Amino acid sequence: MSDSKEMGKRQLRPLDEELLTSSHTRHSIKGFGFQTNSGFSSFTGCLVHSQVPLALQVLFLAVCSVLLVVILVKVYKIPSSQEENNQMNVYQELTQLKAGVDRLCRSCPWDWTHFQGSCYFFSVAQKSWNDSATACHNVGAQLVVIKSDEEQNFLQQTSKKRGYTWMGLIDMSKESTWYWVDGSPLTLSFMKYWSKGEPNNLGEEDCAEFRDDGWNDTKCTNKKFWICKKLSTSCPSK
């Protein structure tokens, strides 16, 4: 009977040692503070305590920054693209409108006035007679040359509302011999339009102007409004 017990003890000893070893291992693990379900937390803790190299952390932050910039660019690019499309549509509409306007036939440019087959430009600035003549030449016209009584009345009334205005009449070549800028002389039929006592050539007054209800001679260096004149354009009949 004692031999059986002794044999039983011998048979149980390896199992007891295994249990003791297992128990000791568990206690040892607990003693070091590890738990079977705490692996992820421990790994995260390692990252937090700077076990990841600093270069990798910087790289991670750089990648995040780049991604943020890309997202912001895409967000702001959408309204910008819509605005560009709207501007393009407006530009195309204006281009089509301009093409339609250009096809319209006008006897005179937009800022000119038509009268009896001629176009007249009434300046809003003031220049000397020579500068006024140059301004007219630059637009393919000349300082106004009066050809009829109707034209004279039209120009006199228009100038009266605006102020003293140059015409294309001078006597620079020979005193008291007045001629137009197209080379034609002043005829006797137009002498009646001089104001009373004019022209008097008071102080080298060699250029004519519209003044109030008649003509006046004055210094060519004075600054006045001016009138340009050119032939109107013939439009084809529709």
UniProtKB/Swiss-Prot annotation:
Positions on the Extracellular side per record topology: 73-238
GO biological process terms held by the UniProt record: endocytosis; regulation of T cell proliferation
Gene3D superfamilies cross-referenced by the UniProt entry: Mannose-Binding Protein A, subunit A (3.10.100.10)
SUPFAM superfamilies given in the database record: C-type lectin-like
Keywords: Calcium, Disulfide bond, Endocytosis, Glycoprotein, Lectin, Mannose-binding, Membrane, Metal-binding, Receptor, Signal-anchor, Transmembrane, Transmembrane helix
Organism superkingdom: Eukaryota
Disulphide bond pairs: C108-C119, C136-C228, C207-C220
Keyword check for Disulfide bond: yes
Official protein name in the record: CD209 antigen-like protein A
GN (gene name): Cd209a
